Amino acid sequence: MTDSEYMDRAEAALAAIEQGCDRINDATDADIDNQRVGGMITISFKNGSQLIVNLQKPLQEIWLAARSGGYHYRYDGKAWVDTKTGEEFFGNLSREASLQAGQPLEFAAA
């Protein structure tokens, strides 16, 4: 994948996260906050915990930092998948956000 293709796909993923936060806030009382600075989004929860998603352009990866640990994702032609487990990024983001928010939250690719 070229750097340009990576950036297009990665930017689409970040936009989907931002849209997901807005949708979740409209549909639930989760009251999550998201702040984007360049290629990084910080998602903050009422309990003070955070998820951090950032782009790693040199590696063509997306990284997720959560209470449970750090995760690295590469695009496999269809989806962003964990480099160790093969799990899909938005499924993992949903699981980690749900754990940290204390209620079911769902993120999806745009």
UniProtKB/Swiss-Prot annotation:
GO terms for molecular function: ferric iron binding; ferrous iron binding. Disulfide bonds: none annotated. The keyword Iron applies. GO terms for cellular component: cytosol. InterPro entries: CyaY (IPR047584), Frataxin/CyaY (IPR002908), Frataxin/CyaY_sf (IPR036524), Frataxin_CS (IPR020895). GO terms for biological process: iron-sulfur cluster assembly. Pfam families: Frataxin_Cyay (PF01491). Keywords: Iron, Metal-binding. PROSITE patterns: FRATAXIN_1, FRATAXIN_2. SUPFAM superfamilies: Frataxin/Nqo15-like. The keyword Iron applies. PANTHER family: FRATAXIN, FRATAXIN, MITOCHONDRIAL. Belongs to the frataxin family. Involved in iron-sulfur (Fe-S) cluster assembly. May act as a regulator of Fe-S biogenesis. This is Iron-sulfur cluster assembly protein CyaY.
